[in-house]
């Protein structure tokens, strides 16, 4: 730190500050600079600094705006009534950032969000009198302002008041691209994983082309180590919109099903074993995992984040399936994160393997199953999946959908499972259906059923393909439920 009389802030007529951050744009700098979570933390720190300075200058009280709420969930109460619940997120660095009230916002179908309620407690009840998709998000507020919106959850009432599906959003990751460091070479591995923007981003010029640490700057045409392409300058790249429940729900609505939704944190924290098929515990869970995977952000000093199946979620899913609940899980790293995870210790690796093979019914085959994103349904012992139609999913970044650079190839782990789809490029198994007998006498169902996809459902191109696939998956998961 240097204490100097900098002209830029000494002569201004308004409060000002100078921030020197990421000024060298070296490899370590850019590990943070390309991370949306880090950029949010920096922006919030600057906001806090300006706020405190002004409060002290004018001898007044201040409050920092709250962080977005967490543990958001929508649950059916029966007779077309629903409850929304959530939890405030404390800021450990700022006691004034607590929530004093909450704004509940609603969106009907593909319209715009509007305020429908202001409440003082983290809960709200409502009635739905139609069969449209109703989406909700929460804003926390205090004297300092409003938080960023929560993730977007949704519901659809099909007239019975008892939803058949609980859509669980486990895709929370926002991050920089994959990195590697091997001898004299290091950089960002966009072909492995180009990262996940927060909603959307415009920060990248293109993939890195020069990985040699000793490569010197010669001129602007040969800038040396870290040089990158310029083909995506000014291009908006889609990321984690935190709004994929609607897309899954739209496919369920097309098949005639009602649904509720909740965050994976809310789902994992509910350890009460409510009867499967009741309004409070739908018989099918649709788990969205997107590009969720365990990563080591920045220089790794703060540990890992974004594990696809953390212990609490793993245990909750196992308990749910042991009751006779059925599961659809889709994501690019559902097998890699469990069975080929470099961040797992031996104990975690053993528990993850048992969960994947015994509960979900698949084994890891390859971490980059395809590069063209083309998939075909194939014949299997399970009747709903006999059609041999082809579809594709997004493998290159676009303004409309995030890219899946490394989809998993997965194979059945038991004789009661079967491959139901394959990648056209090489014939590797892309999806597995699985039936598992229920041993407990308390279950009203004879088996638990699981469909696992090695790529995210929401990245499938075209509503027609998504609707057809979802209808057949639900026909398999709900034959007698």
What are the language-model segments listed below?
Residues 1-60, 454:
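Active-site-adjacent mobile loop/cap segments within catalytic or ligand-binding domains
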Residues 292-406, 415-417:
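A glycine-rich, often tryptophan-bearing local segment used as a flexible ligand/cofactor-contacting loop or short
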Residues 114-121:
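Short beta-strand segments within Ig-like beta-sandwich modules, predominantly Fibronectin type-III
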Residues 160-171, 178-190, 276-344, 444, ...:
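Short alpha-beta junction capping motif
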Residues 5-10, 407-410, 428-446:
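Short, surface-exposed beta-strand/loop micro-motifs that present aromatic residues
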Residues 53-96, 144-163:
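Pro/Thr/Ser/Gly-rich low-complexity, intrinsically disordered linker/stalk tracts
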């Amino acid at each position: 730190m240097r204490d100097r009389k900098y002209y830029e802030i000494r002569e201004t007529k308004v409060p000002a500050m100078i921030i020197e951050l990421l000024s060298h744009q070296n490899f370590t700098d850019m590990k943070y600079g390309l991370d949306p979570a880090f950029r949010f933390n920096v922006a919030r720190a600057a906001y806090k600094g300006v706020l405190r300075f002004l409060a002290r200058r004018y001898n007044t009280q201040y409050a920092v705006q709250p962080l977005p709420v967490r543990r958001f969930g929508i649950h059916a109460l029966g007779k077309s009534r629903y409850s929304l619940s959530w939890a405030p997120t404390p800021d450990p660095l700022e006691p004034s950032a607590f929530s004093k009230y909450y704004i509940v916002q609603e969106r009907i179908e593909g319209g715009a969000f509007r305020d429908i309620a202001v409440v003082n407690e983290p809960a709200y009840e409502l009635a739905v009198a139609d069969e449209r998709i109703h989406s909700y998000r929460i804003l926390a507020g205090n004297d300092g302002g409003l938080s960023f919106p929560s993730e977007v959850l949704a519901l659809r009432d099909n007239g019975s008041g008892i939803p058949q599906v609980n859509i669980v959003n486990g895709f929370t990751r926002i991050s920089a691209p994959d990195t590697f460091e091997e001898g004299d070479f290091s950089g960002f591995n966009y072909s492995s994983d180009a990262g996940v923007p927060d909603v959307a981003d415009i920060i990248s010029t293109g993939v890195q082309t020069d990985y040699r640490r000793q490569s010197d700057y010669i001129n602007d045409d040969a800038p040396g180590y870290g040089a990158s392409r310029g083909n995506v300058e000014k291009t908006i790249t889609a990321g984690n919109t935190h709004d994929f429940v609607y897309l899954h729900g739209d496919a369920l609505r097309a098949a005639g099903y009602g649904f509720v939704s909740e965050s994976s944190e809310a789902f994992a924290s509910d350890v009460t074993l409510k009867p499967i098929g009741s309004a409070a515990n739908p018989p099918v869970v649709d788990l969205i995992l997107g590009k969720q995977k365990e990563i080591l952000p920045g220089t790794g000093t703060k540990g890992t984040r974004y594990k696809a199946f953390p212990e609490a979620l793993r245990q909750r899913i196992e308990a749910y399936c042991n009751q006779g609940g059925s599961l659809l899980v889709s994501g690019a790293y559902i097998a890699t994160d469990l069975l080929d995870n470099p961040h797992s210790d031996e104990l975690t690796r053993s528990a993850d393997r048992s969960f994947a093979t015994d509960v979900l019914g698949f084994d890891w085959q390859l971490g980059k199953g395809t590069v063209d994103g083309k998939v075909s349904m194939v014949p299997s012992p399970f009747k709903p999946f006999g059609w041999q139609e082809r579809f594709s999913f997004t493998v290159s970044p676009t303004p409309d959908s995030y890219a899946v650079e490394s989809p998993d190839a997965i194979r059945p782990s038991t004789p009661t499972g079967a491959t139901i789809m394959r990648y056209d490029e090489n014939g590797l198994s892309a999806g597995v259906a699985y039936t598992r007998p229920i041993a407990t006498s308390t279950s009203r169902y004879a088996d638990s059923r699981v469909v696992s996809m090695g790529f995210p459902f929401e990245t499938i191109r075209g509503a027609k393909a998504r609707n057809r696939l979802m209808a057949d998956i639900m026909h398999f998961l709900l034959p007698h439920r």
